[in-house]
From Swiss-Prot:
Keywords carried by this UniProt record: GTP-binding, Nucleotide-binding, Nucleotidyltransferase, Plasmid, Transferase
Top-rank lineage group of the source organism: Bacteria
Reactions listed under catalytic activity: phosphoenolpyruvate + GTP + H(+) = enolpyruvoyl-2-diphospho-5'-guanosine + diphosphate
Record-listed phosphoenolpyruvate binding positions: T135, G150, S153
Family matches, as InterPro entries: CofC, Nucleotide-diphossugar_trans
Protein name: Phosphoenolpyruvate guanylyltransferase 2
Known EC number: 2.7.7.105
Function: Guanylyltransferase that catalyzes the activation of phosphoenolpyruvate (PEP) as enolpyruvoyl-2-diphospho-5'-guanosine, via the condensation of PEP with GTP. It is involved in the biosynthesis of coenzyme F420, a hydride carrier cofactor.
N-terminal signal peptide: none
Similarity comment: family membership: Belongs to the CofC family.
Gene of this entry: fbiD
GO molecular function: GTP binding; phospholactate guanylyltransferase activity
Length: 214
């Protein structure tokens, strides 16, 4: 349906103050930032992605992460998606859009490439999380982005006409919300920012996460 080489990606990142509240460690703020940085690192290596922006209440993050940050003035993920979409259109992007969650520290560029290749055959597509109930990534080739992120979003996105891509894509499905999720990601192999924290942070190091090469 499309040449999938011109995807613009929106990464909604609420704020460091409220991110990863279910991670039962005191360094959750540092982990949230590391997850975001590793997610962005994988995205920016893709030849199929023309631009990546982050939408966040922490607009000053841009200097830290090296990615444009658009000020989030909404009340949730879907508002952030709309803010990012509007900004991209105002700045000349009229191609295809993807939304990727910011908590994919094990993300491999190959998985996002495979997803975009498969998604290019459908007007709208998405990937469910490892539990099969949430959404880690969606795409649209239409003028507007309609999204319904949150609990049980996979079911809602299906009802909205998004095609679920049934590929394995393990690193794209593994969003990290809990310590158990983080252990699974560590076994898969996380990016360098998360791996550095797992090794250097005393609290995390004491949990003895397995650190496979990212």
């Amino acid at each position: 349906m499309s040449d999938y080489g011109e995807w613009a990606v929106i990464v909604p990142f609420r704020s460091l103050d409220v991110a990863k509240s279910r991670l039962a460690v005191s360094c959750r703020r540092d982990l949230a930032l590391a997850f975001l940085q590793d997610t962005l690192a994988a995205l920016t290596l893709s030849n199929h992605i023309s631009s990546v922006i982050v939408v966040s209440r922490n607009a000053a993050l841009s200097e830290t992460i090296g990615t444009p940050v658009i000020k989030d003035q909404g009340s949730g993920i879907d508002d952030a998606v709309e803010i990012g979409h509007r900004w991209l259109r105002e700045h000349g992007h009229d191609g295809h859009y993807s939304v990727v969650m910011p908590d994919l520290p094990a993300l491999r560029t190959g998985d996002i490439d495979n997803f975009l290749s498969a998604a290019s055959r459908f007007p709208r597509a998405f990937v469910a999380d490892s539990a099969g109930t949430g959404t880690t990534c969606l795409t649209t080739q239409q003028a507007a982005i309609l999204s319904a992120f949150g609990r049980n979003s996979a079911q809602r996105h299906t009802r909205m006409g998004y095609k679920q891509i049934p590929l394995g894509l393990p690193s794209l499905r593994l969003d990290v919300d809990t310590i158990d999720d983080l252990e699974r990601a560590a076994r898969m192999g996380v990016g360098r920012h998360t791996q550095r924290l797992l090794i250097s942070n005393n609290e995390l190091h004491s949990l003895r996460f397995p650190c496979a090469p990212g």
